[in-house]
Amino acid sequence: MRQLAPYALIYLLAIACAAGLATQSQAADAPLQVPIGYLGYRPDPGPLLSNVIPEPADAGLRGAELAIIDSNSTGRFLNHNYSLASASVDSPEALLIAAKAQHEQGLRLFVVNAPASSLRQLSAALPDSLLFNAGSPDDSLRTTDCLANVLHSLPSRAMLADALAQFLVIRKWQRVLLIVGPTADDQAYAAALRRAAKRFGLRLVAEKPWSFDNDQRRSAQADMPLFTQTAEYDAVLVADERGDFGEYVPYQTWYPRPVAGTQGLTPVGWHKTVETYGAAQLQKRFEALAGRWMNDRDFAAWIAVRSIASAVSKLRQTEPMAIRALEISDQLPLDGFKGRKLSYRPWNGQLRQPIPIVQPRALVSTSPQDGFLHPFNEMDSLGYDKPEVSCRFP
């Protein structure tokens, strides 16, 4: 019996080792879970003076959903599993509550489609998380109010205005009339247009505030020619983000000139008419999912989730600040179906990207335009460059 004791001990040790190896194997086989939160809040714009087609209520969310599907199609080969927890609310208070609830569930990566004020609140409330701004084009978030835990996948107003100004310069439409709407967003867009005009050599022959409160559906043909009667211009720039009057400016100006800005010839982050470099496949997948066209907020949310997935694939982890550090490095070129590799600017967290210039049914051009050079990256000719930004990240 005593002779059997050593063999019994060896047998028990073998069983214990096998059990340990089995446990390790099961742990190794467990997929890396990558939960992402989507937080949506779009303020009610109030009554409009035109019958403008409203933005889809699910703009942004559908782009994030498609990106989760795309990320899982490749992530399964790496044993990564992506999931989306979404909350679309009707007030900034409800948005903050939803964000904290998702945070308590363990989420640390978020895509936010909300105004700048809400983004600032979320950034302060979730300091250990990484937020992707897919909803606010506010320039102050990229120049003076930069948030250390926020990256911007939506183009800034400055990027849009610079993209348009480059195209106007190329076409030699350098004398412009600027019409500015009454809202704070209109004023911000107009400020971006003024900056772009000065930067690229456009000349403002006149600037007019829009002060009418009547329905232009009935009176545009009578009002607009007189309103736009100034010194001669090559183009009319419109700053009307809500769509109160801008749709009625084209074809009604005193001089027969193109209209551009928020209406007419428009710089956008994304549009249905973007089809090259594989974009047509993205458009088809989105339309099959959402039953509508993909817009700029959808694309911003899509590329935000894809940015996370690309970083996780390389890092094999989900730590927010490690992801942020990789995103703003030059080690993570992103494919955004825009003909160039995209990346985030380290000085303000803005996604570098070409900007399509479109009319409602066609792609007209894409900026940066040929000839507008930059010592580091031509896409940095759009928006605020490093010397123009006062942000200092830790």
Placement of each model-derived feature along the sequence:
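Bacterial N-terminal signal peptides
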Residues: A8-G20
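Extracytosolic ligand-binding ectodomains
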Residues: R2-Y7, T23-P394
